[in-house]
Amino acid sequence: MSEPNLNPAYTLDQAIANLQQTEDASARYYAAWWIGRFRAAQPETIAALLVALEDETDRSPDGGYPLRRNAAKALGKLGDRQVVPALIKALECEDYYVRESAAQALEGLGDARAMAPLMAKLTGGLAAAQLVEGKPHLAQPYEAIIEALGTLQAVESIGLIEPFLEHFSPKVQYAAARALFQLTGDNRYGDLLITALGGTDLQLRRSAMMDLGATGYLPGAQAIAKAFAENSLKLIALRDLWATHRQRQASSESKALSPASRQILELMDSLL
């Protein structure tokens, strides 16, 4: 879904007022997006977004909840963990895309309370992870759920995630490889993503590249730089790879760039 066009004259006061009113659904939708886009974390915005997360008035033709989706996305960007229980509740929404946005938001907030509810969504394994009849999506937003568990370092979920390496959706496979590398440090999962970069489908190469960047798996740097994809996306993936590597180094006494960090930066320079 594309982002709304940005109105440069829009203000925080307008966003709060538009989100709090209930007459104009499109104004509320834009306000929720704007608050998340600019990370306008204020008590008033958080309170209004929590109300929007349970909105019943803005319904799409297929029965979805567009405002709830934007509210969940915004709450994940504001960094206030008091909203975690509300986002966990949103994992039970009938709208697949609200559940997906809630899982992504919980990943962004990094709160361990989300681990068990997210793991519960993997119950049933591959047998349950099928397409919903008449819909373009699976029973659950497995990519978002698995990626969140990896980011949250939910080591208890390893056994639940492993079967998804065999899922029929390559993107779910990549999410599983990404999370399992984050949870185990086993290089074979990083190597699976490197192999995926050699695929014939551009969209899948892009997905594998972003997942590889999120792992911080250093052997993936050269593979990302050489992948057949847009340089702009390669730069994002390499930036994420570098940031993850540096975060792991943060506990070391040396503040100097490691040889691996220098190599990643040189690869980024070569793509500019």
From Swiss-Prot:
MF terms from GO for this chain are: lyase activity; oxidoreductase activity
Looking up Pfam families in the UniProt record yields: HEAT_2, HEAT_PBS
Q: What InterPro entries does the record point to? A: ARM-like (IPR011989), ARM-type_fold (IPR016024), PBS_lyase_HEAT (IPR004155)
Record's keyword annotation contains Lyase:
yes
- SMART domains, sorted: EZ_HEAT
Under the cellular component aspect of Gene Ontology, which terms does the record hold?
A: phycobilisome
EC identifiers of the protein: 4.-.-.-
- Signal peptide per UniProt: none
Which keywords does this Swiss-Prot/TrEMBL entry list? Antenna complex, Lyase, Phycobilisome
Q: Which SUPFAM superfamilies match?
A: ARM repeat
- Record has NADP as a keyword: no
Q: Briefly, what is this protein's role?
A: Required for the chromophorylation of the CpcA gene product.
Q: How does it assemble?
A: CpcE and CpcF associate to form a lyase.
The record's comment on protein family reads: Belongs to the CpcE/RpcE/PecE family.
Q: What is this protein called?
A: Phycocyanobilin lyase subunit alpha
Organism ancestry: Bacteria, Bacillati, Cyanobacteriota, Cyanophyceae, Synechococcales
